[in-house]
């Protein structure tokens, strides 16, 4: 536990030291920055803000996790599969996000990777995690409380759905200063506690290291943000949460611990579906929310969508609180079951 905390502190310090150099390089090279939604006028001032900051905290977190888990890879440790699988997913999804950002910024391709290209790469990465960790572990079921749901060969489909789904869900959440970074920290704290109670210290080290790196990133990402994480950060973080929940055998908990990401994704799906339905039925598309993902709806008019505009800090605080409460309830449920 002590070494895990040292790893977290080291990740925080290195990220804080490295990020200013990244931001300065970005500005000196006059690299194109983040594009903003015109519908949210208060965001227009952020146009040109450096993005791809996730590159820094991912590199820091991966390197420090490897150093502090070196014994896992050299001594045939029982946690080898889970540790290697989690770090592999963080790296590969980070690379996918990096390619997406790179095409948008350096080649001025607005959509980055084509949707089918991004999805194909995410599925391949998810399959590799399945073969690295899940298949060797023999896992093919979901445990929810005292209920076990046998999925057999279909468990691989669940793994792919979970990883790809939450990767993109966190990506949708990363829309205002600090929202995604702190939301993921809250989620990781919950999984860190579960990992500690289960004695999964190698996974705990990865979790605490990423928490440290994200807190270091938040120093520059809180409002007014000096840098954004980009897809390189958000896609990787979402996939990381998914594989950690799988490795700890508490997959279902991500629906609650990750309730903010679920809410953001659900808002987009509902908006699109309702718009298409009303367009077919009435000849014009109608909306449930002022704008999606949900954090933009809050910005434009609060919960009802018709009130005063919310500041980014207020939106952050509201969604962070929801995430923290949901994580606390989940921990109460999980730890009560584990300690019986």
From Swiss-Prot:
* Gene name, Swiss-Prot/TrEMBL: mraY
> GO CC terms on record?
plasma membrane
Cellular compartments annotated: Cell membrane
Signal peptide residues on this chain, from the entry's feature table? none
Give the transmembrane region(s): 3-23, 53-73, 79-99, 119-139, 144-164, 176-196, 200-220, 227-247, 250-270, 315-335
Lineage, highest ranks first: Bacteria, Bacillati, Bacillota, Bacilli, Lactobacillales
Which Pfam families does this entry report, sorted A to Z? Glycos_transf_4, MraY_sig1
Q: What pathway does the UniProt record associate with this protein?
A: Cell wall biogenesis; peptidoglycan biosynthesis
Keywords, A to Z, come to: Cell cycle, Cell division, Cell membrane, Cell shape, Cell wall biogenesis/degradation, Magnesium, Membrane, Metal-binding, Peptidoglycan synthesis, Transferase, Transmembrane, Transmembrane helix
Describe its function.
Answer: Catalyzes the initial step of the lipid cycle reactions in the biosynthesis of the cell wall peptidoglycan: transfers peptidoglycan precursor phospho-MurNAc-pentapeptide from UDP-MurNAc-pentapeptide onto the lipid carrier undecaprenyl phosphate, yielding undecaprenyl-pyrophosphoryl-MurNAc-pentapeptide, known as lipid I.
Q: Biological process GO annotation list?
A: cell division; cell wall organization; peptidoglycan biosynthetic process; regulation of cell shape
Family to which the UniProt record says this protein belongs: Belongs to the glycosyltransferase 4 family. MraY subfamily.
In its UniProt entry, the species of origin is given as Streptococcus thermophilus (strain ATCC BAA-491 / LMD-9)
Q: What is its EC number?
A: 2.7.8.13
Query: What is the official name of this protein in its record?
Result: Phospho-N-acetylmuramoyl-pentapeptide-transferase
So which cofactors does this thing need?
Mg(2+)
Q: Provide a Gene Ontology MF annotation, just one.
A: metal ion binding
**Which reaction(s) are listed as its catalytic activity?**
UDP-N-acetyl-alpha-D-muramoyl-L-alanyl-gamma-D-glutamyl-L-lysyl-D-alanyl-D-alanine + di-trans,octa-cis-undecaprenyl phosphate = Mur2Ac(oyl-L-Ala-gamma-D-Glu-L-Lys-D-Ala-D-Ala)-di-trans,octa-cis-undecaprenyl diphosphate + UMP
Known NCBIfam families for this protein?
mraY (TIGR00445)
């Amino acid at each position: 536990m002590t070494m895990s905390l040292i790893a977290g502190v080291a990740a925080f310090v290195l990220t804080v030291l490295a990020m200013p150099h990244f931001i300065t390089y970005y500005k000196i090279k006059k690299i194109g920055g983040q594009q903003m939604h015109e519908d949210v006028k208060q965001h227009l001032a952020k146009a040109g803000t450096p993005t791809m900051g996730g590159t820094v905290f991912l590199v820091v977190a991966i390197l420090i996790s490897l150093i502090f888990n070196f014994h896992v890879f050299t001594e045939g440790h029982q946690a080898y599969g889970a540790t290697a699988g989690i770090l592999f997913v963080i790296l590969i999804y980070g690379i996918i996000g990096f390619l997406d950002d790179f095409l948008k910024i350096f080649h001025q391709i607005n959509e980055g990777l084509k949707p089918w290209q991004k999805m194909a790469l995410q599925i391949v990465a998810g399959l590799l995690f399945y073969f690295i960790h899940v298949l060797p572990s023999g896992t093919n079921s979901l445990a929810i409380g005292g209920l076990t749901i046998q999925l057999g060969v279909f468990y691989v489909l669940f793994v792919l759905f979970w990883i790809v789904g939450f990767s993109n869900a966190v990506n949708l959440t990363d829309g205002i200063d600090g929202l995604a970074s702190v939301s993921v920290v809250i989620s990781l704290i919950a999984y860190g506690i579960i990992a500690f109670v289960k004695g999964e210290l190698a996974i705990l080290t990865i979790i605490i290291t990423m928490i440290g790196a994200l807190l270091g990133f938040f120093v520059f990402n809180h409002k007014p943000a000096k840098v954004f994480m980009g897809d390189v950060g958000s896609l990787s973080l979402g996939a990381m949460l998914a594989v950690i929940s799988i490795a700890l055998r508490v997959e279902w908990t991500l629906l609650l611990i990750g309730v903010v990401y679920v809410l953001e994704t659900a808002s987009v799906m509902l908006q699109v579906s309702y718009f298409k339905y009303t367009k077919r039925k009435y000849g014009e598309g109608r909306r449930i929310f002022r704008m999606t993902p949900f954090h933009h709806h809050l910005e434009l008019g609060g919960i009802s969508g018709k009130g005063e505009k919310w500041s980014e800090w207020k939106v952050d605080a509201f969604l962070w609180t929801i995430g923290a409460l949901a994580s606390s309830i989940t921990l109460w449920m999980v730890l009560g079951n584990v300690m019986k």
